């Protein structure tokens, strides 16, 4: 009897430490036209209010489609590495300061409208995202197919059936979506039969000034001339902006993304910065199978890890059709713009898409690099103190005042081009069992001194 009672109490104790929520409890049904953004926002707020520290929490979505619009979404000021720093951002599923949370889509499709970050996860520990896909009803990339290519009259093309467009008053082809209009400057050409990038094409110009319709949904662009684009070629027309990744992670510890697929994002599929220990298993930036009529996925890299540490594991994934690399792992240098004294430097983020977020902490190990030659200068050092220099808080800062434990090498100054590299925020990487195909640019980039 005593053993039975003990087991009963143990099981009850385990059950008491796990809370399960179903999104249908909040009035959101799968496959309805209801805007999911405000409902999910309220559900997350309720979970945060009710759950105690140490409890495991699961938020489940019954399988089906859920539509997220900008209206009712979470609005945030986020500074995201290697993305446009245009704030504020609108977020469909904003997860912040969470512990032991699992979002289980159970095979659901999360479909977004407008210009949004589908999912953000910040300052969280031991969280799992699994079993869902991310897509947009109207991608900001316009897929068109070449139907005629006349050396004198230019290229005639047909937009894909889902592409909404207009010919502007100044005769330019423009893509349309919920709350946005896009003019396209460049494109990537795909073989219409194989979906391979057309050999030796790289980024192609697609000038549409002077465009006109020759028939419904058939457009002639007299100034667009390129003999390589034979009839049947599919072009993903795009701009250079990258405002919103599919999933944004920052300052998280021990995160798993399991069987999550990103079919489109107006940025990178996954951007993780200043995170520790990330596992991707069955993660994909990919099409919806062999019969998907689309040829493209994300506007930039499939996955990107900036200033992370611990171990990054990416396995059993599919990366295809993206407009940049499958994976890029790196840190961000600060340029030395002022030597204050023998222990203090002012460093600045120089990349227009990488600033505004934390760079280092007291106790972090650093080294100094001469930018012209990439030579290491002086000895490794350690941060004793760091604070934003150009504003009162880290958020939105470009410059930092950094005091080091040991004296700085006399050669390091603001005149000769020196960078500061944070060695603490560098990860070990395991990238295995993944498929990369049919994408612009490269495959894998690993810039870390740790084991890869």
Residue ranges and their predicted role:
Residues 16-452:
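Extracellular/periplasmic carbohydrate-active domains that bind, remodel
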Residues 1-10:
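Bacterial N-terminal signal peptides
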């Amino acid at each position: 009897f005593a053993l039975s009672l003990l087991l009963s109490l143990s099981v009850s104790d385990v059950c008491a430490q796990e809370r399960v929520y179903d999104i249908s409890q909040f009035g959101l049904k799968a496959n309805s036209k209801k805007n999911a953004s405000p409902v999910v926002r309220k559900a997350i707020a309720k979970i945060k209010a009710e759950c105690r520290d140490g409890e495991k929490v699961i938020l489940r979505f019954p399988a089906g489609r859920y539509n997220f619009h900008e209206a009712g979404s979470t609005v945030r000021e986020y500074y995201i590495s290697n993305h446009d720093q245009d704030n504020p951002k609108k977020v469909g599923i904003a997860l912040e300061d969470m512990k032991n949370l699992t979002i289980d889509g159970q095979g659901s499709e999360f479909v977004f409208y407008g210009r949004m970050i589908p999912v953000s996860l910040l300052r969280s520990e031991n969280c799992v995202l699994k079993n869902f896909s991310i897509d947009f009803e109207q991608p900001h990339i316009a897929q068109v197919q070449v139907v005629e290519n006349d050396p004198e009259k230019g290229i005639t093309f047909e937009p894909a059936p889902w592409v909404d467009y207009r010919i502007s008053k100044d005769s330019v082809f423009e893509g349309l979506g919920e709350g946005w209009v896009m003019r396209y400057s460049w494109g990537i050409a795909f073989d219409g039969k194989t979906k391979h990038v057309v050999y030796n094409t790289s980024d192609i110009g697609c000038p549409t000034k002077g465009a006109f319709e020759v028939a419904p949904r058939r457009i002639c662009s007299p100034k667009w001339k390129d003999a390589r684009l034979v009839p049947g070629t599919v072009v993903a027309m795009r701009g250079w902006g990258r405002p919103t990744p599919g999933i944004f992670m920052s300052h998280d510890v021990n995160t798993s993304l399991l069987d999550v697929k990103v079919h489109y994002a107006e940025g990178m599929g996954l951007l993780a910065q200043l995170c520790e220990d990330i596992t991707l298993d069955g993660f994909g930036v990919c099409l919806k199978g062999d019969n998907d009529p689309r040829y493209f996925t994300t506007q930039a890299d499939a996955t990107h890890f900036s200033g992370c540490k611990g171990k990054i594991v990416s396995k059993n994934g599919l990366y295809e059709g993206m407009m940049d690399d499958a994976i890029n792992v790196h840190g961000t240098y600060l340029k030395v713009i002022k030597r204050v004294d023998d222990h203090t430097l002012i460093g600045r983020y120089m990349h227009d898409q990488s600033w505004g977020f934390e760079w280092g902490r007291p106790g972090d190990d650093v080294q100094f690099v001469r930018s012209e030659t990439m030579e290491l200068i002086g000895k490794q050092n350690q941060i004793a103190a760091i604070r934003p220099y150009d504003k009162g808080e880290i958020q939105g800062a470009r410059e930092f005042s950094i005091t080091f434990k040991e004296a700085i090498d006399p050669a390091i100054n603001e005149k000769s081009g020196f960078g500061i590299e944070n060695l603490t925020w560098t990860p070990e990487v395991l990238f295995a069992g993944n498929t990369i195909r049919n994408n612009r640019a490269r495959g894998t980039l690993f810039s870390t001194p740790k084991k890869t």
